[in-house]
Amino acid sequence: WRVALEGGADCTVQGLRGLISGTDPHSVGFAVRSLMALRLFLGRIFRLDGRAQEKPTSLLTAAVPADLAQRSQAPPGTPDGSFTLLYMLPREAVYEILNATVHAVLVVAVTPSAGGHHFYWATYIRPVGPITTPYMGLIDPFRRSIVYPGLESWLQRIWLDTVARAGG
């Protein structure tokens, strides 16, 4: 996915993280909040997220090359919400999550563009058991039609608000 972020000064992954974490979570659209709340509720009931707490270290943390780990703005293995950081550079970061439904890697990047910046994200999913394929098949239409577009417009909105407050 690619999100166009118009205007603004230099943009980094860590800067966007700060912007996102400093924003009221209720500013995300109702449909996205509802689907995320439903997922968390079902995760608690069916214990879908328990494996992440049982296994505190990331499976891929040890695979991060030493030079990349040294350049990372936070140590590999740093918890970040439901995810574990593999590495963070100024313009790219990679996170990992492991639970009862998936073992996934989230890649995010920011690049300059003619009108501002582009924010990219991609998720790579590896099945962890027989539930992964049907689970991903069930949620995929909701992710693609509601969650991702909702997050994209939300990110654009909070970015533009920040640019406007900064005067440019």
Please name every model-derived segment:
Residues 155-168:
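Short, highly charged C-terminal tails/helix-capping segments
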Residues 125-146:
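A short acidic/glycine-rich loop-to-helix N-cap element
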Residues 2, 92, 116-120:
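Intrinsic-disorder/low-complexity, polar/charged segments enriched in Ser/Thr/Lys/Arg/Asp/Glu/Gln
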Residues 10, 102, 128:
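Short, acidic Gly/Pro/Ser/Thr-rich loop/turn segments
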